[in-house]
Structures are given as structure tokens and as C-alpha cells.
């Protein structure tokens, strides 16, 4: 996208960044708004914000434009279906825990199911993050940089213990989850967790996708459905604000039914309502 921005500047007669001001940046964003969806405009804003932060730090621009990119973009919020509890149970039960791979994969799926950890936090989890005496898992979330202390529940603890003692290869890396095949190094990226989740779905005969986040979403919905406020869920999940937690309200069907209005007193138009 920065390439398109520079190409647009050339079309406007600029040969370098000198002379480009706030009015030109705003004009580019307005031009983009005529062709791109709000979600794309949101990304363009972030790209330009990082670009100008770099240019300002490098002394290529005299002005700090960070405030210029502080505007909010109203993006369409998608409501993803919630993975049923029966499907989650089937997914976990299908994993063959007699193998090294099964022990590792089961422990990872349990962290997502019971504690709602993101894939990026699962692969970053270190042996030193586990406090067995206190029964705690200490995580500095990759997405928010928020430190979170989670309970090391018995089921999660048993899954981790089984993998660490009976499956995890000896390695220099301190990360808990390692590659099955040599070299036994840490998992390269969060997408690997998504691929493992996909394979588990295939084995369980469930709809196939790579959204390990489905487990976090299912837990969030379960908490809200059981009367936990979105503010408390945000604290449990380590979210910076409730905006990340509010979508769980949209999947709480039972409580949404209580908010539905009846058609009593509303005269039908164009025929009777069936």
C-alpha cells in the first residue's frame, strides 16, 4: 500500500517526500475511501501511520503526523458462529494422546479451550511461565503486551505435564511447544497452531478451518452466557477494553431472546403476519 501511496504522490507531481503535507495525506485517504471498504481504509491508515513514524524518526519529515492518523474507522463487524461444546469435546477426544504429537497437540488445544489463549501466546509460552506451586500460568500477551496471570487448572496442568515429561524433546529452546521432527526447535509462527487445529478438525470430522481463535471465542461466549459481564471477561482475557469482548454478546442467543420485542400492537401492512 505504501507503493500505491508513493505512486499517487508522483501523479500529483511530487518527486520526493519534501513538500508533502497533511492536506496531501488527507486527500489520498479521501481518494482511497471512494474505492476501498472501511476495513481496507483502516489498514491503509495503519500503514501510513507507521510510514510517517519512520520518516519522522529518520529526519525525513519535519512534522510529526501521528495525530493525523488517530481517527477511528467504523468497520463492519462480523459475527462468527460459535463452535458447539459437543464439537469441542469431539475434537479433544479424537486426538491420539499415546503419541508425542498427540500429547503436544492436546495440550495446545486445552490451552485454547479452557483458558482461551491466542495462538501467538501458545507458541510463545515458556517453561518458566508455569508456576506449578502456585498453580498459575504467567503470560505477557503478544497482541496487547498485557501481563496476565491465569489459573493452571487441573485438566490443563495434566495435559502440559504429560507432554513435557513424556513427549517434549530435549532442546535448548525454553519454549514449551517444539517441532516434532528434528531440529526440535520452537514453532516458527502462530499459523502453525492454526494448521494443527485444522488437522484436529479433520480427524474429528468437523468443518475445516484454521481458526484456532474459535476456541477462545467459544469460551468467551460461554462465560457471557453464564452471566459473566463483558468487563470481567475482558479482564480474564487480558483485553485492553471491552470492544474486543462485546462480540460475544452477539452470540449469546438465549439472552438475546430476552431482549426481543413482540409484534403485539403493531398492525400488519400488506396482509396478515404468518
Report each predicted region and the residues it spans:
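Conserved catalytic core of the tyrosine transesterase superfamily
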Residues: 1-274
